[in-house]
Amino acid sequence: MARVVKIDSAESWNFYVSQAKNQNCPIVAHFTALWCIPSVFMNSFFEELAFNYKDALFLIVDVDEVKEVASQLEVKAMPTFLFLKDGNAMDKLVGANPDEIKKRVDGFVQSSRVVHIA
């Protein structure tokens, strides 16, 4: 999954979270808004992360388009990055800090990998 999926409704959010849960796939979600310059600035960096971490599903959520999801997950500032496993938020990072986001994504994806013992 080397791309960022744009979430445009609560239904699409629920669909992708459910799919990821069924496939044991971690989710990194970027909550953004068009009026938030730091958030918009992070979009290309977020796409780069999605390209480099193919084991995770990367979702982008415009809080003005999908208010109910942002509200349900208590997203109050942009940008907010949420890390979900099995449909549950495991970590949250608020702010446009590329180094910290990359570090968190790396640790999160590594810890989410399933080890298969033959």
From Swiss-Prot:
Compartment(s): Cytoplasm
Tissue: Ubiquitous.
Oxidoreductase among keywords: no
Primary location class: cytoplasm
Tagged with keyword Cytoplasm: yes
Disulfide linkage: none
Taxonomic superkingdom: Eukaryota
UniProt domain Thioredoxin: residue ranges: 2-110
Gene Ontology CC: one annotated term: extracellular region
GO MF, any single term: protein disulfide isomerase activity
Pfam families: Thioredoxin (PF00085)
Keyword vocabulary terms for this entry: Cytoplasm, Isomerase
Job of this protein: Possesses low disulfide reductase activity, but efficient protein disulfide isomerase activity. Does not possess deglutathionylation activity.
Family stated for the protein in its record: Belongs to the thioredoxin family.
Protein name: Thioredoxin-like protein CXXS1
Organism: Arabidopsis thaliana (Mouse-ear cress)
Gene (UniProt): CXXS1
